[in-house]
């Protein structure tokens, strides 16, 4: 496989991931936040067994296996439940934007814990990304503290999970980079996520799962999308141009919001798009801060 083809496949993964906010929310509306997520990750895990394969975890570095498992499962649960618990579809898209603080945080953590070299661009990058998220949360009024507080107060758990998830995923990326040694535990991690969600589903009171043709269609679409996205990303990382893929990933907030708005029939305000662009620009500046010499 050529590098160009592998890079293109990796970029397809970014587009696929961009649909997940809308798809996870759509499934959760029929099957519940926990039940819907459990179904998605169960089917995705089965798909990954056939696309990526089931690795021999006995060969994994211990720190990668333990830390990677805990962090990956925690992040995916935070993401899925933050979208499912959102009060409205529009709020689910906002929650997804909060989660996209992770690219900037990943670079910050790489600087703090992995010795990544940087320059002054990291400061405006982080500030712009954070401002963008606050701008989104302010609704039509943009950067309005009162409106932000009022908005978050309508579904505090949802926003808290998304914010926590951004930090967890940044930590996961840092740990993977430091301890993985070329091993890929994604199949195991997705299956563990499914197990954790099913335990939560059966051990706590949950709404009944109501299956309908639209919900089933969204469920299989979400599972296939998630499974193929991880498989495609793996091809890109192994054989493609990682730099191009990294730059492409920083435009995910805009793509994700556009696709979620389409899938959920939830139009977004001009102020929202301003905030989304800020998140992308801030993330790109953080990335450039580690590239300039």
From Swiss-Prot:
The chain crosses the membrane at residues 7-27, 34-54, 64-84, 93-113, 120-140, 148-168, 183-203, 208-228, 244-264, 268-288. NCBIfam families: PRK11689.1 (NF008676). Disruption phenotype: Mutants show increased sensitivity to methyl viologen. It comes from the Bacteria. Residues 28-33, 85-92, 141-147, 204-207, 265-267 are periplasmic. Amino acid transporter with broad substrate specificity. Required for resistance to methyl viologen. May function with OmpD porin. Keywords: Amino-acid transport, Cell inner membrane, Cell membrane, Membrane, Repeat, Transmembrane, Transmembrane helix, Transport. GO terms for cellular component: plasma membrane. This is Aromatic amino acid exporter YddG. One of its GO terms (biological process) is amino acid transport. It is a multi-pass membrane protein. Signal peptide: none annotated. The gene is yddG. Residues 15-137, 167-285 form the EamA domain. Coiled coil: none annotated. Residues 1-6, 55-63, 114-119, 169-182, 229-243, 289-293 are cytoplasmic. Pfam families: EamA. It is found in: Cell inner membrane. It comes from Salmonella typhimurium (strain 14028s / SGSC 2262). Belongs to the drug/metabolite transporter (DMT) superfamily. Aromatic amino acid/paraquat exporter (ArAA/P-E) (TC 2.A.7.17) family.
